[in-house]
UniProtKB/Swiss-Prot annotation:
HAMAP family: LeuC_type1 (MF_01026). The keyword Chloroplast does not apply. It comes from the Bacteria. Heterodimer of LeuC and LeuD. PANTHER family: 3-ISOPROPYLMALATE DEHYDRATASE, HOMOACONITASE, MITOCHONDRIAL-RELATED. [4Fe-4S] cluster binds at C347, C407, C410. Keywords: 4Fe-4S, Amino-acid biosynthesis, Branched-chain amino acid biosynthesis, Iron, Iron-sulfur, Leucine biosynthesis, Lyase, Metal-binding. Its EC number is 4.2.1.33. One of its GO terms (biological process) is L-leucine biosynthetic process. This is 3-isopropylmalate dehydratase large subunit. GO terms for molecular function: 3-isopropylmalate dehydratase activity; 4 iron, 4 sulfur cluster binding; metal ion binding. Catalyzes the isomerization between 2-isopropylmalate and 3-isopropylmalate, via the formation of 2-isopropylmaleate.
Length: 472
């Protein structure tokens, strides 16, 4: 057999039916659902008289619409109906649900891994763009639309076009203060938001190998922002250690057998990718987005680009539009940009590693008077663990708000929105126009960079913090 990439191996193992020049029918190992993209799918099953094909392979939680202050006080009628519908649908169709009373509730892409539902080698889908998060475990995970949600519920399969393979290799050693978020933002900034179109990415190299699972999830989460269908990292000892003793993971001898198979799941020597990119991690800086997509990003010590420095006419027009919407000017220093809001959370950066990183920045300091800062743990489990470690006290004493788990300010589908014309340093994954609220201005950053912005009221190079610590 020809040498194959891990992407091809997982794909081939799950093909139920294929035909020359046609999409493949893939078996889906895990289907994650939430309250926003599932109601129409369940209604479709009901109208057709169908059942959920594999309820044991389906897991639901509530995350997008729910409040993070008083989680039971859902004021928006549409949101309330969606939450109620999910409860009713899961009960009727026999699907496991982590509802608002459950200790397992949280953002779907946070709870899937922490419960041991996400495992290496699986095919995983969810009606959400950032399903690629689960690729951190060496799984093939991608977002699907509502009609596809119904198809998977009723058949446990999905028609998909075989993707091309893209290797992104990052070697070297990251500078102190440079994080997984900076790595993926740097990649997107260098190659654009469309370069991954038609590909599934495998992230390789020592930078990714040295990352924790939380950090790997941050990287894979933003694969979609590069235009890719999915992104993954081959499983290793770090992966296996994370999966051990998780609620739904195999136990005992079954786990040891599975772990041996997972460690063998990797790209063969001599396998050829359709395209490869190699980067030096030591050259990556803390990053800040300045425009209206994740590709409009620069090192924190840079200046907003002037139109004449942009090669394409379309790029110039996009930049001019971004200046206006974001309320910024060409040649303005990133570090001179002031913020009114800071959001630490989302499926990109709301795990323990992220919260510890932010808490390290703010310990003994105070949020600037001009800033409103909130921390939203990615799950009830993360919230509990953070409180056991005392992180919540660090945030509260600094002047942050400490919330319940949910998607929160990542998107304007709940009570947490950025007011029109105001600016937010956010650890989320999208800075599109209106993403955090009508007229909201979003700058994507790492948790450490967000924490520093909260303290100073403007962007600050987090590397200075570590330099000061070294001097002291």
């Amino acid at each position: 057999m020809m040498p194959r990439t891990i992407i091809e191996k997982i794909w081939d193992r799950h093909v139920v039916k294929s035909g020359e020049g046609k999409p493949d029918l893939l078996y889906i190992d895990l289907h994650l659902i939430h309250e926003v993209t599932s109601p129409q799918a369940f209604e479709g099953l009901r109208q057709k008289g169908r059942k959920v094909r594999r309820p044991q392979n389906t897991f639901a939680t509530m995350d997008h619409n729910i409040p993070t202050v008083n989680r039971f006080d859902i004021k928006d009628e549409v949101a309330k109906r969606q939450v109620t519908a999910l409860e009713r649908n899961c009960e009727e169709f026999g699907v496991r649900l982590a509802d608002l009373h459950s200790a397992d509730q949280g953002i779907v892409h946070v709870v899937g891994p922490e419960l041991g539902l996400t495992l290496p080698g699986k095919t995983i889908v969810c009606g959400d763009s950032h399903t690629s998060t689960h690729g951190a475990f060496g799984a093939l995970a991608f977002g699907i639309g509502t009609s596809e949600v119904e198809h998977v519920l009723s058949t446990q399969t999905l028609w998909q076009q075989r993707p091309k393979t893209l290797e992104i290799r990052v070697d070297g050693t990251l500078q102190k203060g440079v994080t997984a978020k900076d790595v993926i933002l740097s990649v997107i900034g260098k190659y654009g938001v469309k370069f991954g179109t038609g590909y599934v990415i495998e992230y390789t190299g020592e930078v990714f190998r040295n990352m924790s699972m939380d950090e790997r999830m941050t990287v894979c989460n933003m694969s979609i922002e590069a235009g890719a269908r999915a992104g993954l990292i081959a499983p290793d000892d770090t992966t296996i250690e994370y999966c051990k003793n998780r609620k739904y993971a195999p136990k005992g001898e079954e786990f040891e057998k599975a772990a041996a198979e997972w460690k063998a799941l990797k790209t063969d020597p001599g396998a050829v990718y359709d395209h490869s990119i190699v980067l030096d991690g030591s050259e990556i800086s803390p990053m800040v987005t300045w425009g209206v997509n994740p590709g409009m990003v620069l090192p924190v010590d840079a200046q907003i680009p002037a139109p004449e420095t942009i090669d394409s006419e379309d790029g110039k027009k996009e930049a001019i539009r971004a200046y206006e919407y974001m309320g910024i000017s060409p040649n303005q220093k990133i570090e001179d940009i002031k913020v009114e809001h800071v959001f630490i959370g989302s499926c990109t950066n709301s795990r323990m590693t992220d919260l510890r990183q932010a808490a390290d920045m703010i310990k003994g300091r105070k949020v600037a008077d001009s800033v409103r800062a909130i921390v939203v743990p990615g799950s009830q489990s993360v919230k509990q663990q953070a409180e056991e470690e005392g992180l919540h006290r660090v945030f509260l004493e600094a002047g942050f708000e400490w919330r319940e788990s949910g998607c929160s300010m990542c998107l304007s589908m709940n009570n947490d929105v950025v007011p029109e014309g105001e600016r937010c340093a956010s650890t989320s994954n999208r800075n599109f126009e209106g993403r955090q609220g009508k007229g909201a201005r979003t700058h994507l950053v790492s948790p450490a960079m967000a924490a520093m912005a909260a303290i100073h009221g403007h962007f600050v190079d987090v590397r200075k913090f570590y330099q000061e610590k070294t001097v002291v």
